[in-house]
């Protein structure tokens, strides 16, 4: 069967977001098409009231069933492909953040059904799922030459329904998602969402292709340049430094907040569906068991994230702080737009759920404490308070919150493998990786064979000294690798 690509939308897929994909389409004249007829449906984000007339027949279908959780269409369970987008809307509402709601399918469903407003929203999401399945089924019937479907994220109803039907028809599905650097992205063959579940979580081994030699130095420099060049498109770049309000010598812990309805939280089973409830518990544990002061950094993207459009996490954490005794209030700083790099320079530890900002914390030498699970858990450079109760006590050993050189080496190896094996740089020169991936479903989108052509950005000596001061772990690591490679090459051959 000849190759023909179907892009699920042109909302996410355009040249600015995925330049090498479009270069590959142009360079190799790859047959492709975009579904463009349902823009208002793509952007519903779990709110389908404005489409109720278009959904009339699907709503009637839903109303014929008593158990909304068990409805199927074309052998696809509607609740399974609707849950994530339903929560994308539900988690913008206050009553979902009271705490005690596990992020587990049955618990979420039962909580939604107990509230009339949520029940109606769920009913419409199920109707949308039914409608999308019928739409895609008819679309694919009319385009039997489609060999590959390419979707963004995989958590929206319109993408989940397409993925389910593509699986039935043996159509290969590639899921794309941005990495936190803003300059790299994932592109993986999969039949489920990619949020907080990229391939390296399931299929990863250290030193898989790069050995302790000059190539290792090049890979390290490449990973370093990608991290230094990061520009998270969801975080406004503001040069605002945090001013330390505490005059004591108590340790400072940074909690990195995420967008309340972020799919990386929604798609990860946990004890709490509400990130806000998890943050509150983390703050309570720090106040109760340590002398640490706490900086909570809310995510500025909440003001622009649909359908939230307000700083919900910041509002709820502020309300929580105001409910505490004054002596505890004085130990907490709530911020939003301040540079996270300026906070890394003064804090003694970092906590978070699954934010990829925790990887940036590792880059600065911290060993983050995870409140939840993430694709980089259990790799040797993060930790859990549940697994290490000595983390939270009055004596507070700062060394436990920092990476040892061996742990930093594991982080460096992980990031090298991420950038050279799992991620595609959003650059023209990476178009060949796209073609390689399309032609071989077992191939990893690997930049390793391009390492010889990579040139890291030039740095002024003042920039270099500043970076050594900020991140001594990284430079000790790179120096060690370079020295090893030189010693190895200087040994006489036998």
Question: Where are the regions a protein language model picked out?
Answer:
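Nucleotide-activated donor-dependent transferases that construct or modify glycoconjugates
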Residues: 2-12, 35-39, 150, 258
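Conserved N-terminal ligand/cofactor-binding loop architecture of enzyme catalytic domains
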Residues: 4, 22-130, 178-231, 452, ...
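A short, glycine/small-residue-rich beta-strand->loop->alpha-helix junction that serves as a flexible
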Residues: 8-18, 151, 263-266
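Leloir-type glycosyltransferase catalytic cores
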Residues: 195-240, 380-493
């Amino acid at each position: 069967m000849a190759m023909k690509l179907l892009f699920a939308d042109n909302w996410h897929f355009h040249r600015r977001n995925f330049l090498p994909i479009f270069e590959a389409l142009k360079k190799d004249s790859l047959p492709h098409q975009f579904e463009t007829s349902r823009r208002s449906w793509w952007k519903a984000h779990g709110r389908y009231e404005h489409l109720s007339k278009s959904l009339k027949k699907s709503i009637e279908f839903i109303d014929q069933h008593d158990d909304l959780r068990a409805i199927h269409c074309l052998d696809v369970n509607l609740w399974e492909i609707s849950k994530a987008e339903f929560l994308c809307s539900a988690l913008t509402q206050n009553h979902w953040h009271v705490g005690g709601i596990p992020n587990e399918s049955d618990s979420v469903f039962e909580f939604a059904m107990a509230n009339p407003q949520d029940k109606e929203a769920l009913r419409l999401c199920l109707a949308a799922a039914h409608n999308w399945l019928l739409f895609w089924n008819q679309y694919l019937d009319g385009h039997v030459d489609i060999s590959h479907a390419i979707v963004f994220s995989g958590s929206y109803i319109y993408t989940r329904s397409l993925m389910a039907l593509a699986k039935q028809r043996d159509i290969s599905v590639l899921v794309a998602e941005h990495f936190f650097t803003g300059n790299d992205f994932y592109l993986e063959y999969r039949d489920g969402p990619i949020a907080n579940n990229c391939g390296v979580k399931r299929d990863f081994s250290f030193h898989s292709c790069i050995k302790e030699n000059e190539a290792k130095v090049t890979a390290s420099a490449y990973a370093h340049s990608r991290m230094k060049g990061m520009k998270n498109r969801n975080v406004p770049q503001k040069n605002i430094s945090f001013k330390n309000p505490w005059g004591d010598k108590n340790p400072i812990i940074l909690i990195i907040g995420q967008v309340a309805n972020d799919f990386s939280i929604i798609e990860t089973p946990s004890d709490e569906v509400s990130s806000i409830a998890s943050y509150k518990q983390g703050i309570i544990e720090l106040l109760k068991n340590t002398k640490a002061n706490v900086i909570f950094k809310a995510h500025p993207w909440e003001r622009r994230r649909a359908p939230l459009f307000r700083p919900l996490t910041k509002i709820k954490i502020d309300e929580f702080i105001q409910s505490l005794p004054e002596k505890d209030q004085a130990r907490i700083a709530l911020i939003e737009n301040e540079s996270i790099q300026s906070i890394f320079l003064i804090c003694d530890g970092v906590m978070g759920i699954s934010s990829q900002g925790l990887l940036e914390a590792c880059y600065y030498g911290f060993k983050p404490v995870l409140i939840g699970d993430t694709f980089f858990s259990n790799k040797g450079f993060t930790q859990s308070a549940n697994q290490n109760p000595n983390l939270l006590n009055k004596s507070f050993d700062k060394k436990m919150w920092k990476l040892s050189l061996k742990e930093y080496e594991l982080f460096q190896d992980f990031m090298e493998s991420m950038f050279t094996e799992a991620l595609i740089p959003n650059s023209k020169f990476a178009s060949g990786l796209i073609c390689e991936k399309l032609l071989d479903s077992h191939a990893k989108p690997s930049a390793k064979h391009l390492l010889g052509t990579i040139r890291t950005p030039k740095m002024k000596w003042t920039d270099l000294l500043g970076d050594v001061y900020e991140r001594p772990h990284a430079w000790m690591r790179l120096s060690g690798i370079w020295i090893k490679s030189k010693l190895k090459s200087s040994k006489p051959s036998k």
